[in-house]
Amino acid sequence: MKLVHKDIEKDNAGQVTLIPDEAEDMWHTYNLLQVGDSLRASTIRKVQTESSTGSVGSSRVRTTLTLCVETIDFDSQACQLRVKGTNIQENQYVKMGAYHTIELELNRKFTLAKKVWDSVVLDRIEQACDPAQKADVAAVVMQEGLANLVLVTPAMTLLRAKVEVTIPRKRKGSCTQHDKALERFYEAVMQGILRHFNFDVVKCILVASPGFVKDQFISYLFKEAVRQDCKLLLENRSKFMVVHSSSGHKYSLKEVLCDPAVTARLSDTKAAGEVKALEDFYKMLQQEPDRAFYGLAHVERASEALAIDILLISDTLFRHQDVATRGRYVRLVDNVKENGGTVRIFSSLHVSGEQLNQLSGVAAILRFPIADVSEPEENSSSDED
């Protein structure tokens, strides 16, 4: 993401102009947008035209519209973002107040205006515009006949390909059908790696499976690389790391990222940091439950006592449409930072973020124990989106 212009007033109102230059930037933009914001961007509009003879036709024209945002739709698989709202600036093709849907496009600038830019949103822009934040981890999570090829970016886990091949069972005295199917499977996974992983960006490729599938695949991969003289694989052999997983399903990625050897190698990545923070929280919950709180009301009380060492909070909560509730989450983040605590904002598109959402989306590891906190009168579930 490129920041073209930023104009924020002292009262925190203002606008920014950004250019999304890769698919992940659409996810960042989705997290910036809120109902009531003003979005100005280039778009295509179908307009009716009347010729001199009176015949009516229609054509598609490119124009720039400014919408008051009403609905925001993000497709996480295609990384497409559509924003629907009403036109709030005069335009030769679209009447004031008319509805339109803008699909934001890569490499086309847009301007977003808000009445209040809070610290969480401004941090998100800083993160999105940091060139160091790229998809530098890839993973192949596999078992016999199934492989998920995944990119782990700082903001999301992207499933790039799923390989499924039926593997017949070994028969007594003959393994031919089984072995041929297994070879077809390994070949398909190899082609998937070459097609979907950018070796110029990826620093590490995790190959994970139960049993010996991962080892057999790596052996096949580099034998084939030598046979086919595939320099791309041979030159990047050191980037491959073999680790254990309980299955070939995508959810096993969490346990892969928890592996101490993996954690050490990926110590500088945001995704690994999120996984470790959640693991530390669960350990604390088991060993010292008075130092592990979750749920907004309980975590707020810990924050008031200046007790929070690490705050774990899901980005889902900052998309809450109720301004007052969203404000509580923003104040919580600001208070923890002001009092020397660490804030980790989890992406709901990471496995760890999905897990945190099951714990209400907000949790904290405390500096010191706080005795049993009585249940708040309000139902904390009403605080969640």
From Swiss-Prot:
Name of the gene: pelo
Main location: cytoplasm
Family, similarity comment: Belongs to the eukaryotic release factor 1 family. Pelota subfamily.
Protein name: Protein pelota homolog
Molecular function, one GO term: metal ion binding
Cofactor(s) listed in the protein's UniProt record: a divalent metal cation
One of the protein's GO biological processes: nuclear-transcribed mRNA catabolic process, non-stop decay
Swiss-Prot/TrEMBL keywords: Cell cycle, Cell division, Cytoplasm, Metal-binding
Subunit and partners: Component of the Pelota-HBS1L complex, also named Dom34-Hbs1 complex, composed of PELO and HBS1L.
Function comment: Component of the Pelota-HBS1L complex, a complex that recognizes stalled ribosomes and triggers the No-Go Decay (NGD) pathway. In the Pelota-HBS1L complex, PELO recognizes ribosomes stalled at the 3' end of an mRNA and engages stalled ribosomes by destabilizing mRNA in the mRNA channel. Following mRNA extraction from stalled ribosomes by the SKI complex, the Pelota-HBS1L complex promotes recruitment of ABCE1, which drives the disassembly of stalled ribosomes, followed by degradation of damaged mRNAs as part of the NGD pathway.
Compartments, as annotated in UniProt: Cytoplasm
Record keyword Manganese present: no
InterPro entries: eFR1_2_sf (IPR042226), eRF1_1_Pelota (IPR005140), eRF1_2 (IPR005141), eRF1_3 (IPR005142), Pelota/DOM34_N (IPR038069), Ribosomal_eL30-like_sf (IPR029064), Transl-rel_pelota (IPR004405)
SMART domains found in the cross-reference section: eRF1_1
Name of one Pfam family that matches: eRF1_3
Lineage: Eukaryota, Metazoa, Chordata, Craniata, Vertebrata
GO cellular component: cytoplasm; Dom34-Hbs1 complex
SUPFAM superfamilies referenced in this protein's UniProt entry, alphabetically: Dom34/Pelota N-terminal domain-like (SSF159065), L30e-like (SSF55315), Translational machinery components (SSF53137)
Organism of provenance: Danio rerio
